[in-house]
Amino acid sequence: MKLSKNDDIKLNIDSLTSEGSGIGRFDGFAVFVRGVVPGDEVVAHIIKCSKNYAIGVVKDIIKPSEFRIESDCPVSSKCGGCSFRNVSYDEELRYKKGRVQDALERIGKLDIEVEEIIGADKCSHYRNKAQYPVSICDGELFAGFYAYKSHRIICNDDCALQPKEFKAGLEAFRIWAEKANVTSYDENTGKGLLRHIYFRKGFATGEIMACAVINGTSIPERDLLVSLLREKLQGLKSVVININREKSNVILGKESKTIWGDDYIRDKLLGKTFVISPNSFYQINHDQCEKLYSKAMEYANLNKNETLLDLYCGVGTIGSVSYTHLRAHETCADL
């Protein structure tokens, strides 16, 4: 049977793509379906059919996989931010290990046994940074994340991956936008003021930065925004506007202005303190980062007679947490 658009077919999902879409085969023909789990038996509705593959959406789950779990996010099926919220964590780790093993063997032609993945102790509310695109509907600001392969915003002010404080920060921005008649940026026209709302948190210090990314040089009622953020956002240390007037989908511009508090927040990794600005590169998952760096230092087995070059290093976390093991170190972000 030849597949055509709008066909409904039964599929057994046997694997996943790197982006988390399920793969099933219909008479040997690959069909990609989002939101499914290996082991699922589903009815898929075909929405695109090409010479070598088809894309479908789930119409019905006939028999759920043993690895399927209930997603803890009400918008995970629409939002493009997560791929594995409906898969057990053990199965997710097994799949990711398999992807690494396959890449080494099939692409790298290397005969290397991949060790077990060191999993996270915390799979929710672990991210220390969030960048929310915004829009305004009927005079009210809403923020969220882009739908899968789209710039359509899925409203989500309570993401399961972000610190709970960020929700309170979004509420402060919503009230300010309504009272100050703030317009949202339109990518098609290049008009509108507010492009993104951006938060950073130091997990070890509790310090939070709130940032408005704007298509302009200033914001209306800035004292009101600061007052609302200070009232609602526990741990607030910095309020910044980032200026991005480019007609592009790049989130941050090169210039930032602090309108309250410090120009940065602080965080600690493995006992070392780091200063983080709006544009700093810094690892997203604090606790997993500490595990990663500790394991890297264990494997490197550095000694006092060695010199470590820390290149393309963001805020220099790897070199800084390693230098106590060394005679000298060089941190250079621009080399």
Tell me the role of every PLM-derived stretch.
Residues 1-327, 333:
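Accessory RNA-recognition modules of RNA-modification enzymes
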